[in-house]
Swiss-Prot record:
Pfam families xrefs: Hemopexin, Somatomedin_B
InterPro entries with a match to the protein in the record: Heme_transport/Cell_adhesion (IPR051298), Hemopexin-like_dom (IPR000585), Hemopexin-like_dom_sf (IPR036375), Hemopexin-like_repeat (IPR018487), Hemopexin_CS (IPR018486), SMB_chordata (IPR020436), Somatomedin_B-like_dom_sf (IPR036024), Somatomedin_B_dom (IPR001212)
CDD domains listed in its UniProt record: HX (cd00094)
Keywords associated with the record: Cell adhesion, Disulfide bond, Glycoprotein, Heparin-binding, Phosphoprotein, Repeat, Secreted, Signal, Sulfation
Signal peptide: 1-19
Keyword match NADP: no
UniProt-listed SMART domains: HX, SO
Positions of post-translational Phosphothreonine modification: T69
Entry keyword annotation includes Ribonucleoprotein: no
Name of the protein: Vitronectin
Role, per record: Vitronectin is a cell adhesion and spreading factor found in serum and tissues. Vitronectin interact with glycosaminoglycans and proteoglycans. Is recognized by certain members of the integrin family and serves as a cell-to-substrate adhesion molecule. Inhibitor of the membrane-damaging effect of the terminal cytolytic complement pathway.
Sequence motif Cell attachment site, location on chain: 64-66
């Protein structure tokens, strides 16, 4: 029997090898499975964890994700006399409105280390009179003990301090003591609100950014400190000194924006701006997919990760990969590496990734022209606590609502939408993703192509009016 022992050993090794070669057969809609050695969920391409037969079994298409075709500030037509979206009111509106996305409401009106992103909910004990609450929220109050703030005028043209996307896709702008939430066309009802009521920090702040990973934590900077939030809740141990968390980054920064890692093995970056210089900082690690299970996935990150399915690896590496620096690099001059951007900026924000290309006339004919502004925000398709999987039919129907046909801003093509149309067609080979960065200075802003690091040459040219293109304010032109 001794001569047979090697055969048994070889057979055992072969069986173990086959067991390691897990398949995606029957798993394409089951989501992430921590117990498996390889994955078949829609994010496995980004995490480089797909099973060997993922492409064959699951047949992923980049068109099943949210695909934007134009940058945030482009219109179907440049109609400067369009009616504003009721944003001519210049006073603060302390009315009761629903919080955006899955942000948690505050239960205490006082400032505590843990801050929530909804100041509207009343304290449970004892409830004050409505008149008293209005006096607290109204910025022009003169009651003793209540700070006085100047009345905020939406279309005043004053510079903004910060812009950032939250993990649920909401876009927030900060100016002075106040913050705004922006929707697809203008400012959401109920804004502006005091930053202290919404974030638990007394404004003004210096800068803000949200990391583009599965957790999507938001960072606010003020003076020598910074605050970190997850799902609207301040993380324990914050605020912290900038020198502790971001070694090499100066205090009192002017602006900041974050970029994703080109893949899970890469590193996220954030750019800080102060005066005429900027600093590039690299995070040393990002959370794993398993660490993010059980919580809501960042919609901004999901949009980026789904684009990894297509053959754009080289472009993403060019955009988001850099040599390792272990923290902050030496400061550089803005004018040297960001061509066309003013020497000093007030705020900055990374725009959404959009895809340019062209369509045949027959494909365009199936769509109806839309005059809606193209600043559609990210839409999360997963709720907190729900398993991250859907059937192929439900996935297709839910995502098609937010899907746009490919177009080119340079060629003047607009965005077409039809919510009942089946979107299972392939991306044209000529399409490629473009990442924009927005720089805000005074009452104007600039859009920069991250790949060329130059201000986009479009019509109307940059700089453009922040009030008109981002706030929905009426134009002075007739």
């Amino acid at each position: 029997m001794a001569p047979l022992r090697p055969f048994f050993i070889l057979a055992l090794v072969a069986w173990v090898s086959l067991a390691d070669q897990e398949s995606c057969k029957g798993r394409c809609t089951q989501g992430f499975m921590a117990s498996k050695k390889c994955q078949c969920d829609e994010l496995c391409t980004y995490y480089q964890s797909c099973c060997a037969d993922y492409m064959e079994q699951c047949k992923p298409q980049v068109t099943r994700g949210d695909v934007f075709t134009m940058p945030e500030d482009d219109y179907w037509s440049y109609d400067y006399v369009e009616e504003p979206k009721n944003n001519t009111n210049t006073g603060v509106q302390p009315e009761n409105t629903s919080p955006p996305g899955d942000l948690n409401p505050r239960t205490d009106g006082t400032l505590k280390p843990t801050a929530f992103l909804d100041p509207e909910e009343q304290p449970s004990t004892p409830a004050p009179k409505v008149e008293q609450q209005e006096e607290i929220l109204r910025p022009d109050t003169t009651d003793q003990g209540t700070p006085e703030f100047p009345e905020e005028e939406l279309c005043s043209g004053k510079p903004f301090d910060a812009f950032t996307d939250l993990k649920n896709g909401s876009l927030f702008a900060f100016r002075g003591q106040y913050c705004y939430e922006l929707d697809e066309t203008a400012v959401r009802p109920g804004y502006p609100k005091l930053i202290q009521d919404v974030w638990g920090i007394e404004g003004p702040i210096d800068a803000a950014f949200t990391r583009i990973n599965c957790q999507g934590k938001t960072y606010l900077f003020k003076g020598s400190q910074y605050w970190r939030f997850e799902d609207g809740v301040l993380d324990p141990g914050y605020p912290r000194n900038i020198s502790e968390g971001f070694s090499g980054i100066p205090d009192n920064v002017d602006a900041a924006f974050a970029l994703p890692a080109h893949r899970y093995s890469g590193r996220e970056r954030v750019y800080f701006f102060k005066g005429k210089q900027y600093w590039e900082y690299e995070f040393q690690q990002q959370p794993s997919q398993e660490e993010c299970e059980g919580s809501s996935l960042s919609a901004v990150f999901e949009h980026f990760a789904l684009l990894q399915r297509d053959s754009w690896e080289n472009i993403f590496e060019l955009l988001f990969w850099g040599r390792s620096s272990d923290g902050a690099r030496e400061p550089q001059f803005i004018s040297r590496n960001w061509h066309g951007v003013p020497g000093k900026v007030d705020a900055a924000m990374a725009g959404r990734i959009y895809v340019t290309g062209s369509l045949s006339h027959s494909a365009q004919a199936k769509k109806q022209k839309s005059k809606r502004r193209s600043r559609k925000r990210y839409r999360s398709r997963r709720g907190r606590g729900h398993r991250r999987s859907q059937s192929s039919n439900s996935r297709r129907s839910s995502r098609s609502i937010w899907f746009s046909l490919f177009s080119s801003e340079e060629s003047g093509l607009g965005t077409y939408n039809n919510y009942d149309y089946d979107m299972d067609w392939l991306v044209p080979a000529t399409c490629e993703p473009i990442q924009s960065v927005y720089f805000f200075s005074g009452d104007k802003y600039y859009r920069v192509n991250l790949r060329t690091r130059r201000v986009d040459s479009v019509n109307p040219p940059y700089p453009r009016s922040i009030a008109q293109y981002w706030l929905g304010c009426p134009t002075s032109e007739k």
